[in-house]
């Protein structure tokens, strides 16, 4: 009898959810009968010996990407209130908490995707079924000092101006002890497949042409500058 490896990991208690199981597989950390599993949907023997080479530091690989950005740009989130747009499983949120964020407002258009350990954490305010295109006055507290964004199936150029306006019209502070906010740091994960034209995206949603990727990033930078953001730089995630 064969089983999907992601299902098997959950059934055996090696992963708390299929999202977590898939992240472990994609990180190359799952072995079935001492052979590395390449795909989350890979079929393996139901009785296979399955082991994990090492635990991921965050609930998804996205956390490692944000960690890299924080280090690269020298951004400290300790003691700050943050907003995670497109939170999904919670990789970014997990990274923020592990780096000392005081509170995280986690927005996602879906429902119930966030890992339970984060959903049940009192420092996390879950805003499910929230399309961030509709961010408005009062949706963000006045003490938000950091925003991260990991969105799919929409261009971030549609969100950056909306986010800027929401920050300008933010509500009252959520934490009395949070540091006074003068500058808000924003980290955006740019996905070229959602920024490029339809004819520029290949099979599987992959943009292989370096020129298209550069142009997509440039469009995001131009949008950010036009919306009043100060663009510090970029990096490969």
Regions found by a protein language model. Name each.
Residues 89-100:
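Conserved SAM-binding loop of SAM-dependent methyltransferases across substrates and taxa
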